[in-house]
Amino acid sequence: MKDKMSVFAETVLRQKYAQDGETWADVAHRVVKTVYKSVSAPKSLVEQTTQYVIERKFIPGGRYLYATGRPYHQVNNCLLMRAEDSREGWADHLQKCSMGLMTGAGIGTDYSSIRSEGKLIRKTGGFATGPCALMQILNEAGRFIMQGGSRRSALWAGLKWSHSDIQKFIHMKDWIPEVRALKARDFNFPATMDGTNISVQLDDDFFTAFNKEDSLAEQVYWSTVERGLKTGEPWFTVDCGKNKHETLRNACTELTSADDSDICNIGSIHLARITDLEEMKSVLGCAIPFLLAGTVYSDVPYAKVDTIRTKNRRLGLGLMGIHEWLLVHGKKYGVDADLDKYLEIYATSTDVAKQFAKEWDLSAPVKTRAIAPTGTIGIIGETTTGIEPIFCAAYKRRYLKGHIWNYQYVLDPTAKRLIEREGVNPEDIEDAYVLAEDVERRLAFQAHVQKYVDHSISSTINLPQWGSELNNKDTVQKFGKTLMKYLPHLRGVTAYPDGARDGQPLTPVSWKTAVKHVGEVFVESMDICELKGGSSCGS
């Protein structure tokens, strides 16, 4: 496969990750050589890993590409936090989150332990303001703290389904028409929780209650589904069985933990560039030790993070290019026996990690696999992101250059290859909008892949706009029943109706329009903020 990058991939590389005019090969050498020095890796491993990165068969997470070699090198991504229910706990949480954001981490917080709004505070005689208040304080901090001084802060908030304030939480983003209009004109206009992704947390008790037709469980479920179908949030995270204590998540929700101040550490294998099963084993055998070395190399924002990282040493090796792999092999998006052979090798990462941890005298990682949404590294890899289908054959993508928002017309690289090499009609490519008519296929596939993943999968189901034929008040029950069929087998689910938020980063356009303008860069008429349509973790 040719290694020459497209103009758009080169633009993203140059503006987000390259240091001092580096080429992609330069970035690969800088990142791999520097990270492996922390564990005295053998020369053969360094050279082979570097070659796989150059060939884009394995791409480390965005923090590795950006921060490796800098004086402060926090290459592990998001912090996974738990907010404690006390004045000291609130202050400590805000301080740690600020430290994390300023050094490059996204923040995911479980707020379920905070007492509900209106509860009596015995020491002062006052009343609690509840978890939603603390979420909003952190949301406003994130508005003014550029993550690592270079990008918009990434935040996630979760609240348990049985919390007394759950309905307030579910409706936090029900912005009044006046606010929506102002944000349509200027997306920097502040609105409640506009910089935070939110999820309702489900557990074994929820599913037991729902199956017994418990009124609270049903009310929470259906109100969440309807809000999600209308506005894109909130949706669900799922923590059941052996994972029941892992309620903490990173900002994109694919990493999970039970321990406050845990940290995620991600990179992805580009499945569509892997030639066969033997090469899959070889790439895996380089990706895992690289991420393991990253747990030694990376700086952290405060001491507890290092303590928890040493205890858990979580790795988040993901996959991307799954839909491209299926397309190249003439297969439809969905469960496939040949794909499973690659997933089975992927699942051996636990044993590979234990082997290298023993060789390097490190604690063995408690878990090793998490499929991130691979936003910008998916662009660099020029493939389909995570487990996502092709978004669409051609689209307009907005991105930040300094403090100014630009956009370019993009020909999806997978679609482009199929159209140019195989003569496929652009209108015949099965994309996210086609699959919006078959939500069950999307959910069934995610549930199947989850069997091979010990953390979680961050994936967004694209849906038609609320009020359209396939997404309206009459389709809520059908969607909700289909979702419930698969929800116990997932670790989380997200869906996004087209146009739910003004200023969304990806907008479908015609193939003809994109071809006409490809390679051109346009400047937005106003400075507006990017929503999550790829990895807010820079993965």
Language-model region placement:
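Conserved, charged catalytic cores of large soluble enzymes
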Residues: 1-47, 123-137, 147-245, 319-354
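Acidic/polar, glycine-rich intrinsically disordered N-terminal extensions of enzymes
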Residues: 1-75, 81, 481, 488, ...
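Catalytic alpha/beta core of large soluble enzyme barrels
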Residues: 4, 248-260, 267, 291-296, ...
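Function-dense linear segments that define catalytic or interfacial modules
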Residues: 14, 19, 34-41, 50-123, ...
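A glycine-rich phosphate-binding loop feature that marks nucleotide/adenosyl-phosphate handling sites
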Residues: 52, 66, 111-117, 157-166, ...
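Extended active-site and interfacial segments that coordinate phosphate-rich ligands
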Residues: 91-99, 115, 127-139, 173-189, ...
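A structural-propensity feature for long, helix-poor, extended segments
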Residues: 116-155, 274-299, 403-446, 454
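Internal maturation/activation junctions in enzymes
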Residues: 286-306, 310, 321, 326-374, ...
